[in-house]
Amino acid sequence: MERYESLFAQLKERKEGAFVPFVTLGDPGIEQSLKIIDTLIEAGADALELGTPFSDPLADGPTIQNATLRAFAAGVTPAQCFEVLALIRQKHPTIPIGLLMYANLVFNKGIDEFYAECEKVGVDSVLVADVPVEESAPFRQAALRHNVAPIFICPPNADDDLLRQIASYGRGYTYLLSRAGVTGAENRAALPLNHLVAKLKEYNAAPPLQGFGISAPDQVKAAIDAGAAGAISGSAIVKIIEQHINEPEKMLAALKAFVQPMKAATRS
């Protein structure tokens, strides 16, 4: 949890926003997945947002669903995902690592056991995509017991009550949704979210990172100009993996070429 605090403090000092890539653990296989994550960090990623393969990913569009299918095809299991997380943490001691999960994966392990395992391997935050704020108590309580930041999604139509709850319960960062719907780079991020950012600040929420539909440097800049602390990009990155699925070296080069200008756009 503290890794987010020190990251945001460092970025503020350098007058930069955060660029956070999302990938699915184990896509397209464990070994290449680790190389992908190393490449993202070398290219300038400030934090990681990682998914674990799940059979029914409701919030995800086709690009990330395909990533899950590739990971399943490679035989990736939840237990292996935790092994991979431990390896990432060992190699990269300071980078914040966030998980994007679905509730069933947490229930399968047992809520407390799941967060205990997260703490053990060095995960900093968990966002459970299909658990609304009002049903989040058992998750966020277990998270805090194990020093893991509970992350909440702030939708573009959030009312004042929801904004207050997100500010009060969330830690680490706030996932600011560019638009409603499922993930995907095809639908570009919509209107600037200045009013939401202002309210979240007023209620002392964790720093907002804007996600969904972020696929170009100008959108990263726009998110930061609107007051967000940074931007999360998933589908655009996962698409690069898909496009170069049979050319591992080309894939890593293309990922690097994508991340560098995205990170550069965070510098004012």
Swiss-Prot record:
Listed pathway(s): Amino-acid biosynthesis; L-tryptophan biosynthesis; L-tryptophan from chorismate: step 5/5
Pfam families tied to this protein: Trp_syntA (PF00290)
Transmembrane spans: none
EC id: 4.2.1.20
MF GO annotations: tryptophan synthase activity
Gene3D superfamilies, per the entry: Aldolase class I
InterPro entries the UniProt entry points to: Aldolase_TIM, RibuloseP-bd_barrel, Trp_synthase_alpha_AS, Trp_synthase_suA
PROSITE patterns with a match to the protein in the record: TRP_SYNTHASE_ALPHA
Active site residues per record: E49 (proton acceptor), D60 (proton acceptor)
Keyword annotations: Amino-acid biosynthesis, Aromatic amino acid biosynthesis, Lyase, Tryptophan biosynthesis
Known catalytic reactions: (1S,2R)-1-C-(indol-3-yl)glycerol 3-phosphate + L-serine = D-glyceraldehyde 3-phosphate + L-tryptophan + H2O
Biological role: The alpha subunit is responsible for the aldol cleavage of indoleglycerol phosphate to indole and glyceraldehyde 3-phosphate.
Binding partners and assembly: Tetramer of two alpha and two beta chains.
Similarity-based family: Belongs to the TrpA family.
Name of the protein this chain belongs to: Tryptophan synthase alpha chain
Gene field: trpA
